[in-house]
Amino acid sequence: MAERANLVFHNKVIGGTAIKRLISRLIDHFGMAYTSHILDQVKTLGFRQATDTSISLGIDDLLTIPSKGWLVQDAEQQSLILEQHHHYGNVHAVEKLRQSIEIWYATSEYFRQEMNPNFRMTDPFNPVHIMSFSGARGNASQVHQLVGMRGLMSDPQGQMIDLPIQSNLREGLSLTEYIISCYGARKGVVDTAVRTSDAGYLTRRLVEVVQHIVVRRTDCGTIQGISVNTQNGMMPERIWIQTLIGRVLADDIYRGSRCIAVRNQDIGIGLINRFKTLQTQPISIRTPFTCRNTSWICRLCYGQSPTHGHLVELGEAVGIIAGQSIGEPGTQLTLRTFHTGGVFTGGTAEQVRAPYNGKIQFNEDLVHPTRTRHGHPAFLCYIDLYVTIESGDIIHNVTIPPKSFLLVQNNQYVKSEQVIAEIRAGTYTFNLKEKVRKHVYSDLEGEMHWSTDVYHASEFRYSNVHILPKTSHLWILSGKSYRSGSVSFSIRKDQDQMNIHYLSTGERDFCNLLASKKKVRHKLFRFNPSDKKERRISDYSIFNQIISIDHCHFTHPTIFHDTTDLLAKRRRNRLIIPFQFQSIQERDKELMLASSISIEIPINGIFRRNSILAYFDDPQYRTQSSGITKYRTIGINSIFKKEDFLIEYQGVKEFKTKYQIKVDQFFFIPEEVHILPESSSIMVRNNSIVEVDTLITLNIRSRVRGLVRLEKKKKKIELKIFSGDIYFPGEMDKISRHSAVLIPPRTVKKNSKEKKMKNWIYVQWITITKKKYFVLVRPVILYEIADRINLVKLFPQDMFQERDNLELKVINYILSGNGKSIRGISDTSIQLVRTCLVLNWDQDKKFSSIENAHASFVEISIKGLVRYFLRIDLVKSHISYIRKRNNPPGSRFILDNESDRTTINPFFSIDSREKIQQSLSKNHGTIRMLLNRNEKCRSLIILSSSNCFQIRSFNHGKYYNGIKEGINQIQRDAMIPIKNSLGPLGIAPQVAHFDFYRLITHNQISIIKNGQLDKLKETFQVFQYYFLDENERIYKPDLCSNIILNPFYLNWHFLHHNYCEKTFTIMSLGQFICENVCIVQTKNAPHLKSGQILTVQMDSVGIRSANPYLATPGATVHGHYGEILSEGDILVTFIYEKSRSGDITQGLPKVEQVLEVRSIDSISMNLEKRVDTWNGRITKILGIPWGFLIGAELTIAQSRISLVNKIQKVYRSQGVHIHNRHIEIIVRQITSKVLVSEDGMSNVFLPGELIGLLRAERAGRSLEEAICYRVLLLGITKTSLNTQSFISEASFQETARVLSKAALRGRIDWLKGLKENVVLGGMIPVGTGFKRIMNRSKQRQYNKMTSETKKKNLFEGEMRDILFHHREFFFFVSKNLCDTSQQSSI
């Protein structure tokens, strides 16, 4: 009883660590047997108390935190604001991701902190609270998921899923939350994150590497060791104790002259306490790294056994234990993810808050403006920054540490608890960094644009990857893309309007004809005065066609249909061509049909002398078949042959000119041509004669009778059929020199009979072989060309009454060269002759210096009559677009909402407010032509009403740009000139530099009609538009200017000089505007959507919808400027650093990377400078001769320690403690191989051979020569395949290869390891079988050699002192290197 009264009673909570210490002390004092009896009593006591308490767990015991509702709501509100800023283009994707992580992580951590106080207040005896917070079962993370919120989850790659699980397991998960939560769960829907199989395979590889490591000696005799500094705050105490306990000292420990511990003494708790209290010198310990043999290990280098607490016994299989100790926790931790479910773990930066209200002041010279990782503006301070907060008479000083962000401005008033600074988290928490790629995908379909200030140049010439040099916006302009393999949109111009249902509804025949390169078929309809529509599909013979898509001038003409008459009126220095719409009955029969007249205007709108203004393809010069064109001057020759066959003919001689203009007639020799693939089956032979409708291939039949000629060209076969008759002449010499000649209609004498030839023929000599030849007589078509086409046929006679400097000339020319073959495409007709309208002007004194004529378009609508004019001036016009303000009700030109309207005139404009509203709200969009690198594939993009929107709120008060309205209440035309060409809105605008302005005046305009009716005077108001030139300057005209129009006589007068220039802050065409930007200085200012400005009018702005994406420097942009992207395509890729996740499912791959020696982190940019600095300091301190040798030795040791620390960090983050000696055994094996160099030990080892490090050193000592080798880091897999036992290698991987190579080399396996003995069924050399196999004589011989080595290696002892007694210098150098590298990177 007296003894029990002296016992001390501790009324405290005992945790797992305290129980471990108690058990360790019990074993030390009482031994194993008595300790196990004590622990059995503790276990019985615990079970009895749990039974008496009767703890049970029900679903009602899971109590949710009451404040969860408003906390989640607040986090959602913050996320919504963040999403809006991202939508506006203020923050980019990575900043949004980081801030979203911190918002939800902070919310989740608040729940975790509130759990324990909530249980204590509401239900202190709650079973969940008792079991989890006492440590009996469960932990805070698991309870947090039960009653708090699951929070953010990780995917299998360790990336955070940007959708937090707001529910907990008590409330239940939705389907989406359940699937997301299963990413990290065991046996879930998505089980890819579970690394159980990987952990098992890792264990197998580790055991393969170290299965032969057995404790076979007591002491290896090494004098080396690893130095461990005393406890000085740099290393946590717990890790320092774990590093030392169970080790053996490599050297005596002194304090002054007093010896505290001796060499080969094992370190226990008592000795560690003495080291802590006495603060001795650095402690040198023996580790597996210092053992002198790699095939086994001694007791002193291994240390104490972790199970018994004393030195390890001989025959202990420490290699197997080491492999299992590292691999098995990975499996167990992977299984443990069933409870936590792969919850994302991260950290937030520390914040500094203001203590009270006041004005903040700091030195602005010590900070630099920057951007936080959340996208907020801030100041970065590089040194300690002293901040003062003044509040009345109180001055509070705050010191901001370096590399922190200051979130307020100087002299700003701050409120209490307001965040004023953000301190970057400590290096120990965030030192595990990894580079992550974040892809941003396009949210809509459209074309890509960069900001104007972005320099974009790809790294490679044809690469579509661009690196951004600075922060800028990427824009995706909305629009839908239509692509076709060979479509040439010849009648579509950039900015033209068309029906958006055109390509998707019943107009497939048009696209198919274009795709097959057949003749273009236009659907036409005209309007009669009675406003009745007529539709018809015109004949092939009326329309222009596509001859070759390689000639841009002929494939992109503006085509006017047969609803237009081409009329012209010439005046002084001006040519005005009106396009007047008339009915068929009123059409002048003498005028040539203008449907095939194509106006051809340069892109810049400038004509030079002798430029082609228009061209006309006469239908009579068209043919449907392929053939050869011939045109020559005519001469007469005669050749007499034998009596039986006489041919008299009129021969011709070739007249070689590039452009044959003055040809009266030319000849066309037809032939049938087929281009067939090389693999096609041809059913006719070469030089054979076929009849009409003969089967040539499986699906092609001949159309004519004639001779077949086959020719192979570039993996294709060209098949020609020459129509005509065949003659076999008697003598070859008389006719061969006259082959390929044309014969006119003549009388032929044959056998005393005369036969008259009605048509021209073409004689062609065909030679099959030297003895086989014949003459082919082919039919010829003769075309006569008129001398000149009278301009009166093209234009009315009254147009040429006045003389002018401007002239129009009509010139004919043949499209193909002389003797050139013309090939038709399928059923497409071929144009042989083209008539051109050439523009020229007299070179008199006044206009001798004028070389250019400027073209412009004019449109006038008067009471429903719309007239279009192409105007050509020698002096550039300032006004070229005139419209009538309003139209009578009911008058209309073309119904725009007709779905069958497929081709819209490029000059067409909409005439009323109703029509533009229909076009914007229903079916109409705008074409934008796109140029692709692949010329064979063209595409167009259609902007529909869903992609364009109109803002009409400029009706009263001030306008944008500060322009005030002079007269209110004026009804304006609502037309948006989408076809406006003021700015480079398209890649290939047809009229890019035309002046395209509205007329500006408030005065009246008089129009005098001098027609068949009586004279009528009418006045109307002109639109209020402002002039905008290409330099984005606004010109406001004189309000007193008048314009008098006489549209019938075209006696126009333009006032060009009465402009008063005034500059405003304007919105230019093509400018990008982000959402929520105010552009109108009014009270009810509209908040625009983001987009690009298409049109600017006095009362409205047309904006094309677009999405902005903010990109930072170094981001990778995928695609070219103007490229069409589909929805979901990768737009940009960010590369940023993030903290590595603490989840073991992501930690195990890192362990595997270290053990397999794969590169993890990128190499530092200034690595060479750091190595040079290191070598310089080592040489300076230790001396020149031995500097690099000692540096190499330290590098090997330091690399081993670094590998151990990296593996330990992963396991310690999960709360798993593995003794360093287990990891050191593994690391020793993967760092113990060297590669023999080319110039070293050539007489012993082969160059490139892998040998052990100690074996190489022994060979060098025995040979007494320099050792040249390179130390390698081999992965555990390669190490397992490079052992001394080929049986062990063959049982691991590549069995056939290993065994065959061993047989060829004659390798001998000494069966020293465990695995090879197990395979062969022998006794394994560990445990009880160890003493029988061990060779005692070998042991005595080795001990003798060890004692001799100790006497001779005095120099090694001195070097050991240099290496390990200067450990503090090594830490000092490392710290300086780290600091210098951080400063250089900053």
Curated annotation (Swiss-Prot):
CDD domains: RNAP_beta'_C. It is an enzyme of class 2 (transferase). Binds 1 Zn(2+) ion per subunit. The keyword Transcription regulation does not apply. One of its GO terms (cellular component) is chloroplast. GO terms for biological process: DNA-templated transcription. Keywords: Chloroplast, DNA-directed RNA polymerase, Metal-binding, Nucleotidyltransferase, Plastid, Transcription, Transferase, Zinc. NCBIfam families: rpoC2_cyan. In plastids the minimal PEP RNA polymerase catalytic core is composed of four subunits: alpha, beta, beta', and beta''. When a (nuclear-encoded) sigma factor is associated with the core the holoenzyme is formed, which can initiate transcription. This is DNA-directed RNA polymerase subunit beta''. It comes from Glycine max. The gene is rpoC2.
